[in-house]
Amino acid sequence: MKVIFLEDVKGKGKKGEIKEVPTGYAQNFLIKKNLAKEATSQTIGELKGKQKAEEKAQAEILAEAKETKKALEDEKTVVSFSEKVGPDGRTFGSITAKKISEELKKQFDITVDKRHIELDHPIRAIGLIEVPVKLHKEVKAEIKLRIDQA
């Protein structure tokens, strides 16, 4: 019996795959547990339509990520911070991914999720710093930060 997998099933198939499996296994396990459905011409057509829509959505997300990268890597896009500095040259407060994301939105109206900003640890130094950002699995960019003494 041909089935379309609705979920990943270890050793049998991945979500969206169309495979031939034993009839008993399909009816008594896969279909009952909503892990798969019978592959009819109608369900195959629905699957193809969903896959096309998903590909289109992924292409839009990729295009948006490339647009954001272009905006971030513009020479004028330098996020400015003004922090109090102690005698050792380190800031009193630290600059986190959340702060960077908020300032980017406030200063340049560019939205970047704080989870995409790749900071190993919060920034406590002053000066010019470049921070890597992973906008998409294929698109990486750098945010330029200028941290001045208040």
Swiss-Prot record:
This protein's GO CC annotations: ribonucleoprotein complex; ribosome
GO molecular function, one term: structural constituent of ribosome
Species annotation: Streptococcus uberis (strain ATCC BAA-854 / 0140J)
Protein name: Large ribosomal subunit protein bL9
HAMAP family cross-referenced by the UniProt entry: Ribosomal_bL9
Highest taxon of source: Bacteria
PROSITE patterns named in the record: RIBOSOMAL_L9
UniProt similarity note: Belongs to the bacterial ribosomal protein bL9 family.
Alphabetized UniProt keyword annotations: Ribonucleoprotein, Ribosomal protein, RNA-binding, rRNA-binding
Gene Ontology biological process: translation
Function: Binds to the 23S rRNA.
